[in-house]
């Protein structure tokens, strides 16, 4: 496995692979990899001949008061994860390699990005769409792998690829959880011991909501109220949003009559965590 920092080198290597008829899988990340990322890399390795993992903390998807400067970074640790999971190249560019000083072109999306995380982080998805488009252009993979924990992001990337006729297959992979149900996240490292215990309230609330739907409840407002009550029982938790939306359009639904995404964002102390489940009727 190699670590590559330049766009030119990644392109040259992928070009060689494709000249030999090899399929290329791609896993874009911001680093500080956990078992969720590892599962994406392993799946990419199983389904492709070669795998590229990008590690780039993308500055343009962070808001002015968000955690860009404190986002955890550990390339040595990440390299070991990538190599053991089957990656062939880590693409680890500097900011200057990805963005010219006078960079002024962005990829934006209407509708799908308005609610959920887009509502409280209004510039986030413009940054995500822009960097993912750039990475797709640089790596030119056959398939790209994203985790379902970031369900809105996955829907946005699928729509972007469709709308812009990008010839890459987008594959969503299941959420990987800790033994107590907390979704794996690089931001879990921010949590104190007390906050880490409190964070289990996210999965507990969603589990109860899923059971309620399975028992026949179809009123979205009742599901939202149930989740709200459970989360508010934890003194360290502060709700950002609780939504029941169409799993494709991300539009709110009043009644659960087709495939829906039940998604939440909750602050545990100062750390914002997200979780979700999809319910298919």
Q: What label would you give each PLM region?
A:
Residues 226-281:
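Phosphate/ribose-recognition catalytic cores of enzymes acting on nucleotide-derived substrates
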Residues 2-236, 245-247:
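Nucleotidyltransferase catalytic core that binds NTPs
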């Amino acid at each position: 496995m190699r670590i590559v920092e330049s766009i030119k080198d990644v392109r040259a290597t992928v070009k060689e692979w494709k000249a030999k008829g090899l399929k290329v899988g791609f896993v874009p990340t911001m680093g500080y990899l956990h078992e969720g990322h590892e599962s994406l890399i392993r799946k990419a390795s199983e389904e492709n001949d070669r795998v590229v993992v990008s590690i780039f903390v993308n500055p343009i998807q962070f808001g002015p008061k968000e955690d860009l400067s404190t986002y955890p970074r550990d390339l040595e640790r990440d390299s070991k994860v990538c190599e053991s999971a089957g990656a062939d190249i880590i693409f680890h560019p500097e900011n200057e390699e990805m963005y010219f000083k006078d960079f002024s072109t962005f990829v934006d999306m209407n509708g799908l990005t308005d609610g959920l995380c887009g509502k409280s982080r209004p510039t986030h998805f413009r940054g995500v769409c822009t960097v993912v488009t750039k990475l797709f252009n640089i790596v030119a993979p056959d398939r790209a792998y994203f985790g379902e924990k970031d369900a809105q992001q996955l829907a946005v990337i699928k729509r972007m690829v469709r709308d812009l006729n990008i010839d890459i297959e987008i594959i969503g992979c299941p959420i990987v959880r800790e033994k107590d149900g907390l979704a794996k996240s690089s931001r879990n490292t921010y949590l104190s011991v007390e906050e880490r215990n409190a964070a289990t309230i996210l999965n507990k609330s969603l589990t109860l909501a899923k059971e309620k739907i399975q028992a026949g409840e179809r009123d979205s407002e009742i599901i939202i109220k149930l989740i709200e009550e459970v989360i508010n029982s934890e003194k360290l938790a502060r709700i950002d949003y609780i939504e029941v939306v169409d799993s494709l359009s991300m539009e709110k639904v009043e009644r659960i009559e087709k495939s829906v995404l039940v998604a939440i964002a909750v602050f545990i102390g100062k750390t914002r965590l997200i979780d979700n489940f999809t319910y298919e009727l």
